[in-house]
C-alpha cells in the first residue's frame, strides 16, 4: 500500500470534524469582522486628527491617495491609471507635504497595529472562555486528527484535556513538567524602530481605545469625553518626532528591553503559573506544577559583543548591576506590601518555631531594626520578620550601587557586615532571600493560612532571582583565535596558533586545559583587541563571584566551525578562574552557534569529537534526576537563510537537530537547542506555536531556548494579555511537541523528497544571490539599504566590516530589511517555486504527495504557511517602480533581467503554493489575517511611491558637490532641498513602511 493510499484511508476515517479546528475557523471569521467594525472608529479618529493638523489642500490630496490605495482587485489599464495618478499626486507635493503624508500613513499603520493587538488580546481571553465551555460540552472525539498535526494555538485547558483524552499517562506529564526548561532571550537587534517616547503614547491610546470599544456601559457624555481624550492623545503623538535624533547607546537599548519586564512580565509570570496550575487541576488533579520556574528569561542586550565594539566589559557589568537594581526595587516594594498585609497577631494565631528562631538571629544582626520595630510589632512576628527582610534588601541595593559606581575592574571591600565579621548584612544570594520568604510561607501553611501575594512573590523570585534575566555573552570565533595567536607569538612557540593545523590546535588546547600552571602572563601590553578579549573573561569571573553564576553563565560563539573554536573559549575561561580542571567544574556554558549551511552540516562531527573527550564531558553542567551532562547548541536561521535561501536553510536546521539529538543521546548527553529566530520569515520568524510543533519529534524533551528580537517585543509583550498569550502559546507548544510523537518525521521517502527540494531551492537561490554579478548593484540601488543604515535605531553597525560593500559583510538584518521595504521580500520565498516545479516535472503525481505533506506533516505545513504569508505581502508593481525609478541607466538591462527572474519565480511559487493548499487565494483559510494583510498591502502603496520619490532626489543630491543646507520651501518634491531634509523624509517613509509591514529585519 502506498503513502497516498494510507492518506486516503486516513481522510475517509475522519467522520467527525475536529471541534477545536471548527472553533478556530469561526474565531478567525469573528476576528476579521471585529477588525472591520473597529477599524471604522480608528479611521475616523485618524482622519479627524489629520484634518485638524494639516492644511485643507494637503488633506484632500492625502485622502485621495488613501482612496486610490483602497481600490483593491483592479487590474490592467485601470490599475496602471491608478498608479499613474498616485505618482502625479506625489509630484504635486513639496517636501513639507511629502513628509506630512509619510507621517500620516505611518500614524495610520501604527493605529491599526494597536487595534490588532487589542483584538488579539480579546481573542485570547475569548479562547480561554470558549475552551472551558467546550471542555464541558464536548465528548471524546475518536476521529480527531493526531494532536501533533494541530497548529492552532491551544490554551493550557485545551491542551491538558486533549492529552487526557489521548491517554497520556499522568506520570509522563509530571516528569516532563519537572524537566521543562523554556528560556526566552531578548535581543536588541533588529531594533524596535519606534521611539520609546512614542511607545508610551501608543500605550495610552491603546488603553483609551480599549475603554471606548469595550462592552462596558457608558453614558453619552462619558463616551464623548473618551473620544476627545483619544483625539487629544493622537494629536500629541502627531506632534512628537518619530525619528531618533541620536544613535542609541547600548545602555539605552538595555533600558528599552527591560521596560517590558518592569511594565508587564514581572506581574504576568505569576499569572502564567496560576493558569497552568488551574488547567492542570481540571484534567490531571493529582499532578502539582513544580515550584521551580519552567519558563525563564535571558538577554543579549548589553552582553552581545559580536560585531558591536560599543559592548565593552564595563557596559556588561553596568547592565548586570542595572538589572539587579530593578529587581531589588521591585522586591522591596513587594515586601513592604506584604508587611502591610500580614498583620497576624500572636494573640490569635500560632507561629512556627523556625520563624521565632530566625527572629532572634535577626535581632542580633540588625539591632537598630529591633529597637525601631520591636515595640510596634511585638505581637506581629510576620511584620517584624519582613522588616528585617526589607533591611537586608536595602543593604543589598546599597552594595549593588557601590559595585555599579566602582566598575568591574575595581575591587570593593565588604562594608555591609554585622557584628559577626563572617556575616553579611546584605543578601549574598537569591537563596538566602527565598529561604526567608519560605520560612514565612511554611509558618502560615502550618496554621492553615495562605497568602496569594506571598506566593506571587515566591514565583517571581524563582523566575527572576536577583538577576532578572541571565546575560548571554556572544562573541565571534575569530576574536578568540586571534587573541590566542598573539599569546603564542609572545610565548615564542615553535608554531604560532594560526600556523597550526586543526588537529595540532586541538592537541595543544587540550594539553593546556589540563595544565595547572597559568598560560597568560600578567603585565603584558597586548593589542587592544586581545586585551578586550581577555578582559571579558576577567569581568565574567568577577561578575559571578559578586552576583552568582546565574547572572551570566552562557558564552555563545558565533560563526563556530571547528572543535578548536569551543576549546579556545574553555582555555581562556580556565585561565581566568571560570573553569577548574582539578575539581572538574565549570561556571561557564560554552555554546557553539552554527550559522551557515556548511557549518550546520558539519555540526554533528564537531560535537562527536567533543563528546568523545572525557575532559569536555566532565566540564558540562548536570541536569535532571539522572544528572546528565547538558550541552546547549545554537542554530542560526539568519545567516543560513542569507547563505542558501529559505527552504534550504529550514531543512538543514531540521536535519541538524535530528542528527545532533541522536548523537547526544548516544553519549548520554542532554541537549538544549537554542533557536536564533528573527522577527521576519527571512530570519526564522513566524508564529511561535507552529514553529515549535514543526521541530523534529524527540529533539525538544521539554527544553528549548528562543531569541525574542527587539522588533517583535512590542507586538508580544506590550500588553499583559498579549504577553500571557505568547507565553502560554510557547509553553503549550513545547508540551505538545515533547509528549505527542509526530509519526511523519520518520518517513524516509519524505525526508528524501525534502532533501531534493532543499538542494534545488539552494541552487536557484545561489544562482541569483551569489553567482549573478549584478545582484549586489541591484540590491544597493533598488532598495533603501544605504538609507536604512542612517536610521539612528541601533548601537550596532549594519556591516561586520567597515567600508565593505559585498554581501558577505552585510548583516542578515539589513539584508532582509532592504528587500522588505521595496516589497520584494525575496529572502523569505525565493527558490521555493523552482524546487517544487522541478520535483513535479520528475513526477507530476507528487502534487498529491505534497498536498498530503501539507496536511499531515507540521514541518512542511509550517514552510508552506510561511511562504504563503510572505507571498501575500509581495507587491511586484511597487517593486518594479523601485527598480525603474532608482536603478541607474547603465544597469537598466541587467536589472530588467534580474527583475524578470524574480517575477517569474514569484508567479511560479504563488501558483504551486495555491495548488498544494487547494485554496483559491493566498490566506483564504485565515480570513482575519487575509483582511489585515490586504488592508496593509493597499494602504502602504503610497508610502512606497513617496519613498521612491524622496530617494531619487536624495541620491541625485548625493551625486552632486556639497551645497548649502538651506531648504527651499516652494515647489514640488523634485526641486532642490538640503540633503538632511530629504534624508529625514526618506527615513520617515522607512518608519511608516516598517509599521505597515510590522517588521524591519
UniProtKB/Swiss-Prot annotation:
One of its GO terms (biological process) is oxaloacetate metabolic process. InterPro entries: PEP_COase, PEP_COase_bac/pln-type, PEP_COase_Lys_AS, PEPCASE_His_AS, Pyrv/PenolPyrv_kinase-like_dom. It comes from the Bacteria. The active site is at residues 189, 642. Its EC number is 4.1.1.31. Its cofactor is Mg(2+). It catalyses: oxaloacetate + phosphate = phosphoenolpyruvate + hydrogencarbonate. Keywords: Carbon dioxide fixation, Lyase, Magnesium. NCBIfam families: PRK00009.1 (NF000584). Belongs to the PEPCase type 1 family. HAMAP family: PEPcase_type1. This is Phosphoenolpyruvate carboxylase. It comes from Prochlorococcus marinus (strain SARG / CCMP1375 / SS120). The gene is ppc.
Amino acid at each position: 500500500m502506498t503513502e497516498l493510499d494510507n492518506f486516503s484511508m486516513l481522510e475517509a476515517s475522519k467522520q467527525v470534524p475536529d471541534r477545536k479546528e471548527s472553533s478556530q475557523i469561526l474565531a478567525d471569521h469573528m476576528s476579521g469582522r471585529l477588525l472591520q467594525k473597529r477599524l471604522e472608529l480608528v479611521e475616523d479618529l485618524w482622519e479627524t486628527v489629520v484634518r485638524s493638523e494639516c492644511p485643507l489642500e494637503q488633506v484632500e490630496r492625502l485622502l485621495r491617495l488613501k482612496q486610490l490605495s483602497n481600490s483593491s482587485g483592479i487590474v490592467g489599464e485601470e490599475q496602471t491609471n491608478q498608479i499613474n495618478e498616485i505618482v502625479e499626486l506625489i509630484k504635486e507635493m513639496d517636501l513639507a507635504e511629502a513628509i506630512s503624508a509619510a507621517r500620516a500613513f505611518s500614524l495610520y499603520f501604527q493605529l491599526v497595529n494597536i487595534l490588532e493587538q487589542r483584538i488579539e488580546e480579546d481573542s485570547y481571553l475569548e479562547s480561554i472562555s470558549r475552551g472551558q465551555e467546550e471542555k464541558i460540552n464536548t465528548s471524546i472525539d475518536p476521529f480527531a486528527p493526531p494532536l501533533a498535526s494541530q497548529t492552532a494555538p491551544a490554551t493550557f485547558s485545551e491542551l491538558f484535556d486533549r492529552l487526557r483524552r489521548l491517554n497520556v499517562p499522568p506520570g509522563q506529564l509530571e516528569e516532563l513538567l519537572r524537566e521543562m526548561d523554556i528560556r526566552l532571550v531578548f535581543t536588541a537587534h533588529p531594533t524596535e524602530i519606534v521611539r520609546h517616547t512614542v511607545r508610551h503614547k501608543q500605550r495610552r491610546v491603546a488603553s483609551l481605545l480599549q475603554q471606548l470599544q469595550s462592552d462596558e456601559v457608558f453614558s453619552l457624555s462619558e463616551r464623548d469625553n473618551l473620544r476627545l481624550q483619544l483625539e487629544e492623545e493622537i494629536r500629541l503623538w502627531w506632534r512628537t518626532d518619530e525619528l531618533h535624533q541620536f544613535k542609541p547607546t547600548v545602555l539605552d537599548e538595555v533600558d528599552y528591553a527591560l521596560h517590558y519586564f518592569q511594565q508587564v512580565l514581572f506581574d504576568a509570570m505569576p499569572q502564567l503559573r496560576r493558569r497552568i496550575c488551574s488547567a492542570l487541576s481540571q484534567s490531571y488533579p493529582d499532578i502539582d506544577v513544580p515550584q521551580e520556574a519552567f519558563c525563564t528569561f535571558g538577554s543579549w542586550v548589553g552582553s552581545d559583543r559580536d560585531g558591536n565594539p560599543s559592548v565593552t566589559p564595563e557596559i556588561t557589568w553596568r547592565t548586570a548591576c542595572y538589572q539587579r537594581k530593578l529587581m531589588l526595587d521591585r522586591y522591596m516594594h513587594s515586601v513592604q506590601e506584604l508587611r502591610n498585609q500580614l498583620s497576624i497577631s500572636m494573640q490569635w494565631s500560632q507561629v512556627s518555631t523556625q520563624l521565632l528562631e530566625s527572629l532572634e538571629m535577626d535581632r542580633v544582626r540588625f539591632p537598630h531594626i529591633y529597637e525601631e520595630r520591636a515595640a510596634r510589632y511585638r505581637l506581629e512576628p510576620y511584620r517584624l520578620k519582613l522588616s528585617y527582610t526589607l533591611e537586608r534588601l536595602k543593604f543589598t541595593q546599597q552594595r549593588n550601587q557601590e559595585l555599579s559606581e566602582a566598575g568591574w575592574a575595581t575591587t570593593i571591600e565588604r562594608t555591609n557586615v554585622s557584628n559577626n565579621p563572617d556575616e553579611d548584612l546584605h543578601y549574598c544570594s537569591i537563596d538566602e532571600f527565598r529561604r526567608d520568604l519560605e520560612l514565612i510561607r511554611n509558618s502560615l501553611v502550618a496554621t492553615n493560612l495562605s497568602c496569594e501575594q506571598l506566593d506571587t512573590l515566591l514565583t517571581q523570585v524563582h523566575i527572576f532571582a536577583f538577576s532578572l534575566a541571565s546575560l548571554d555573552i556572544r562573541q565571534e570565533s575569530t576574536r578568540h583565535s586571534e587573541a590566542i595567536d598573539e599569546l603564542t607569538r609572545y610565548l615564542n612557540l615553535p608554531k604560532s596558533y594560526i600556523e597550526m593545523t586543526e588537529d595540532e590546535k586541538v592537541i595543544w588546547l587540550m594539553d593546556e586545559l589540563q595544565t595547572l600552571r597559568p598560560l597568560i602572563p600578567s603585565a603584558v601590553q597586548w593589542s587592544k583587541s586581545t586585551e578586550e578579549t581577555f578582559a571579558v573573561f576577567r569581568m565574567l569571573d568577577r561578575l559571578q563571584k559578586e552576583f552568582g553564576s546565574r547572572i551570566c553563565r552562557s558564552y555563545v560563539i558565533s560563526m563556530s566551525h571547528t572543535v578548536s573554536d569551543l576549546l579556545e573559549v574553555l582555555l581562556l575561561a580556565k585561565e581566568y578562574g571560570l573553569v577548574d580542571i582539578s575539581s572538574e567544574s565549570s561556571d561557564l556554558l560554552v555554546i557553539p552557534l552554527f550559522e551557515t549551511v556548511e557549518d550546520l552540516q558539519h555540526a554533528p562531527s564537531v560535537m562527536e569529537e567533543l563528546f568523545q573527550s572525557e575532559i569536555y564531558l566532565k566540564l558540562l553542567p548536570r541536569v535532571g534526576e539522572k544528572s546528565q551532562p547538558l550541552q546547549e547548541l545554537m542554530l542560526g536561521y539568519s545567516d543560513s537563510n542569507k547563505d542558501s535561501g529559505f527552504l534550504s536553510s529550514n531543512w538543514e536546521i531540521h536535519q541538524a537537530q535530528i542528527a545532533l539529538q541522536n548523537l547526544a543521546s548516544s553519549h548520554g548527553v542532554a541537549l538544549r537547542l537554542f533557536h536564533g529566530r528573527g522577527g521576519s520569515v527571512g530570519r526564522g520568524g513566524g508564529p511561535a506555536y507552529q514553529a515549535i510543533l514543526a521541530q523534529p519529534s524527540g529533539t525538544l524533551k521539554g527544553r528549548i531556548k528562543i531569541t525574542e528580537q527587539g522588533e517583535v517585543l512590542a507586538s508580544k509583550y506590550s500588553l499583559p494579555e498579549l504577553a500571557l498569550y505568547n507565553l502560554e502559546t510557547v509553553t503549550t507548544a513545547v508540551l505538545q511537541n515533547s509528549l505527542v510523537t509526530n509519526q511523519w518525521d520518520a518517513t524516509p521517502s519524505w525526508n528524501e523528497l525534502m532533501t531534493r527540494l532543499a538542494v534545488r531551492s539552494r541552487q536557484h537561490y545561489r544562482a541569483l544571490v551569489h553567482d549573478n554579478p549584478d545582484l549586489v548593484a541591484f540590491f544597493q540601488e533598488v532598495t533603501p539599504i544605504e538609507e536604512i543604515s542612517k536610521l539612528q535605531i541601533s548601537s550596532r553597525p549594519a556591516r561586520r566590516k567597515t567600508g565593505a560593500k559585498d554581501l558577505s559583510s552585510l548583516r542578515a538584518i539589513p539584508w532582509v530589511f532592504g528587500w522588505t521595504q521595496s516589497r520584494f521580500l525575496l529572502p523569505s520565498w525565493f527558490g521555493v517555486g523552482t524546487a517544487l516545479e522541478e520535483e513535479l516535472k520528475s513526477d507530476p503525481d507528487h502534487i498529491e504527495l505534497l498536498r498530503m505533506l501539507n496536511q499531515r506533516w507540521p514541518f512542511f505545513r509550517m514552510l508552506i504557511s510561511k511562504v504563503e504569508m510572505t507571498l501575500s505581502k509581495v507587491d511586484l508593481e511597487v517593486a518594479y517602480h523601485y527598480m525603474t525609478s532608482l536603478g541607474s541607466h547603465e544597469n537598466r538591462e541587467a536589472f530588467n533581467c534580474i527583475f524578470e527572474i524574480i517575477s517569474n519565480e514569484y508567479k511560479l511559487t504563488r501558483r504551486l503554493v495555491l495548488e498544494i493548499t487547494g485554496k483559491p487565494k493566498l490566506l483564504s483559510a485565515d480570513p482575519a489575517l487575509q483582511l489585515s494583510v490586504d488592508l496593509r498591502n493597499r494602504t502602504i502603496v503610497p508610502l512606497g511611491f513617496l519613498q521612491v520619490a524622496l530617494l531619487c532626489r536624495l541620491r541625485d543630491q548625493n551625486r552632486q558637490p556639497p551645497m548649502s543646507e538651506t531648504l527651499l520651501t516652494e515647489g514640488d518634491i523634485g526641486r532642490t532641498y538640503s540633503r538632511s531634509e530629504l534624508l529625514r523624509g526618506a527615513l520617515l517613509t522607512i518608519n511608516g513602511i516598517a509599521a505597515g509591514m510590522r517588521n524591519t529585519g
